[in-house]
Each structure stands twice: as structure tokens, then as C-alpha cells.
Amino acid sequence: MGFNNLVSLAALIEKVFPIRYTPAGIPVLDIILKHESWQEENGQQCLVQLEIPARILGRQAEEWQYRQGVYVHVEGFLAQKSRRSLMPMLRIQNIQEYKG
């Protein structure tokens, strides 16, 4: 199946967890993103507020490990949080500071 799974989101880096490394030495950074916006749904304005766990791998993980409190624009895909949890986690493929 070739379903799309693409996420683009502007959010605040609410929390940054300590960086860790895979057995292969790849940096892994888990963060919590906080988003708030007004969206139109069924012709009505709707306030959307959410927090979502996210993960950054590789060189970008090291670059963002001290950036808590920064607004960012991220692009990535949703995946299960772990082998034992089907809760969603945003896997970030591209992250940049949000300039508004």
C-alpha cells in the first residue's frame, strides 16, 4: 500500500530530553512539541491545541539538543512510539527555526 504519511507543523519545542545514542552510534533526541492555532472545520473556527512527542535522528539531533523554548517548523511522518506502544510519535526529517 502506498498511503501518504506526511506531517508539516509549526510548534514550540516544549521539552527536550537528554540525547542518547543507538548501539551504532547514531544520536537520538526525543522532544515534545506544543502547537496552537486556529483552523477552519465545517465552516467554523476551531482552536487547536496539542502536544506531540517527536524524535530527531542523526546530526540534527545534536544540533537541536539545547534548543528548548524555540519555535520551529518541522516536516516528517507519524510512526508508533515504540515496539510496545501504538501511540503516535512524529519522526522529524526536517527541522528549522520558525521565523513567522
From Swiss-Prot:
InterPro entries: NA-bd_OB-fold (IPR012340), Primosome_PriB/ssb (IPR000424), Prisomal_replication_PriB (IPR023646). The keyword NAD does not apply. Coiled coil: none annotated. Signal peptide: none annotated. Keywords: DNA replication, DNA-binding, Primosome. Belongs to the PriB family. This is Replication restart protein PriB. It comes from Neisseria meningitidis serogroup B (strain ATCC BAA-335 / MC58). The lineage of its organism: Bacteria, Pseudomonadati, Pseudomonadota, Betaproteobacteria, Neisseriales.
